[in-house]
Amino acid sequence: MRPLAPLTRVALSTLLLALLLVGCAQNEPEFSVSDLPPGDPARGAEIFTEPPGGASCAHCHPLDGERSVGPPLTGYAARAAGEVSGQSAEEYTFDAILRPSKHVVRGYSNMMPGSYEDALTQQDIADLIAYLLSR
């Protein structure tokens, strides 16, 4: 087998690096907040504590205001409404669930899993948003 020419090695290395970066990038959701059905806050409360995928929101996001791994959700609706200029509380919450690295709360590291799009249905997401915005 002939050794690769230096230019070919550079091209292959560049291609492999590009593929690696694409594979590590956070995927954009295939739908937007405007595509979601109406949410049910009561069902959202159930998903918050015992989601279908098994990773409980409540484990890292306390409801009592205590500091934990993730920011507490006491008064969440008011904070979400003013967190990002030009973005509604629903859009902000949608991003927090499906694009968690987009807006990292000051004082916290982004330790949330990449996205819950594969674990939650659109109805689950709508219900969870409705619950969080009822707080």
Residue ranges and their predicted role:
Residues G53, S101-V105:
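Generic structural signal for secondary-structure transition and capping sites
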Residues N27-E30, E66, S134-R135:
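Inter-heme linker and motif-flanking segments adjacent to c-type heme-binding CXXCH motifs
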